[in-house]
Amino acid sequence: MKCKNLLFSAVLMALALPATAQHKTVLYDSTSVVMEESGLSHVINHQRVRANDFAGCKELATVKIDYDPLSAYVEFRQVLLHHANGNVEDVLLRVYDYVAPARLIYWGASQKMVHIGHLDPGDEIEYVTYRKGFTYALLSGDDDERYIPPMRGHFYDIVPFWSDSPVNKKVYQVSALTAKNLRFELYNCGAQFDCGVQIDSTVQGDRTVYTFTKDNITPLKREPRALANNDIQPKLLLSTSPNWQAKSVWFYGVNEDYGSFVPTPEVQAKVNELVRTAKTEQDSIAILTHWVADNIRYAGISMGPGEGFTLHNAQMNFTDRCGVCKDKAGMLVTMLRAAGFKAYAAMTMAHERIDRIPADQFNHSVCAVQHRNGTFEMLDPTWVPNVRELWSSAEQQQGYLIGLPEGADLAYTPLSAPENHYVRINANTQIGQDGSLSGSITITAEGQSDAAVRGVFSCRTAEWMRNMELELRKIAPAARITKIQHTDNDNYLKQPVSITYHFSIPDFAVIDKHTLIFTPLSARNFFSRAMSHLRFDTAPETRTQPFADACSRLVEIKETITLPAEYKHLHFPFVNGVANPAASFGCQYWMEGNTLTFAESALLGKRVYDPADWSAFRQTVANQKMLAETPVILTK
């Protein structure tokens, strides 16, 4: 009976809640930060959260704090369970500390958690946490020394004034030494968002206390494929660092002082061996970048004190043949220097914007090499294994900072021309009197599109044939494949990928004495794995949020079809042409004798798009989808 009553109550509550109801509500979220002269910060967070339904109860059954024991100390100071009936339960005794689940990066990150136990809708969790330290470790010492941030004497923070759940009140307060000249700025406030953050400051002796308050934060209804929340919703950046040049000088110095880029005799010998056949400086850069990309496996094994901004030294990386992005970047810097280049480590933020306030807006380490003419070229050995690029164009329109002895300013990678990432499909086919189709179809690709096509080879060799056959059978399930030819995947640097299919497809077209109806095989979005724009939902006519695709791209399709007879009339799908720098589209059908030719071109000009680009982008995608689904009709 009790179970039935609980189920009945749950159903009633679900029916009573609006369709957009949130599972929990944050009643208040208050953070107080005190910064010391060294940059060490003491952070106290006080939250009270209400479970609105049983899903919220489940979500709040455990409260967790993620931290790195090498660089941060955390504790729960108070955890109370406020029952809806007014009873209050202290659950602070149920505190656990476990090593956090890890995949590919094994640095010993931990989770401190409190088991709340059973909750009912309407119950509230109130907890107070204390933290000192930072996200990344550098060089540790005694006592609080290991909790001082890498850029000693400086403080930075990124505070989201957005939430996935409703927040009735959010307060962020920081007490900083006035002499530190704390700088701050609110971002993403404008037409769509009125930040509505109240800012107060008071001077207390040699300190200035800044308080930022916002009431009634409501969750944003995100549009599909929108940018990261920190790029489109209100956030606060704070930093005592004077500018990006200072951060650049620090990043250069901390790794040079550690000796991250000193080549060992073994590394020098390997570099000499690799560049022996290079004819130009670009040859040497490409050879070394791809060697690091393909031979240093991505796996983060902790070196103990020193993880974070410090790049592992060359001896460790070359011996272990594994590491995370910073280790692969460090290995490449070392090898380039061993080859006589001026090379430097750099930091970037993958798939999220870096703003002008010099807070720690980085999640990825890369490499910069200086050419003889003084220009820099960005290299990313982490993102280009088996990719015919030196810097992944999936990172175009992305901010980065090079660590230089004289300092560097924040910069952004440029657009990569769509022609650098072409997908070309060429088919020669013949329709028989029985409506069958036979012939060949070839796909070639370059850049990021090349990598997407060659995804069929990213498995055991025994599975390659099945994967390639599947790509054709996705658009023609009845296809009988007689032969497949492809480029050597192990020698991917020598030429762009190319795969050719020879096939026959029974009952491909509808045919009678006077009419022939079919959709060209090449129009059916063959190898759509290389055309991520096709995964966009084109139903919405407008967008208010910027959005992102995998990469810029050019799709070119041509098919020559030999018909079983000559036809007088051709009826084909009508599409609206698109001519826009962000996206463009064109197609043609023409008939000569018993030959029909189909051609299509789709250009996607960016990785990151503005809402104003949606109309052209949407029409381009819709056109390609329509041609894939709409047949041509030929009559005599």
What kind of region is each of these model predictions?
Residues 22-636:
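A sensor for short, sequence-defined functional sites
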Residues 1-23:
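Bacterial Sec-dependent N-terminal signal peptides
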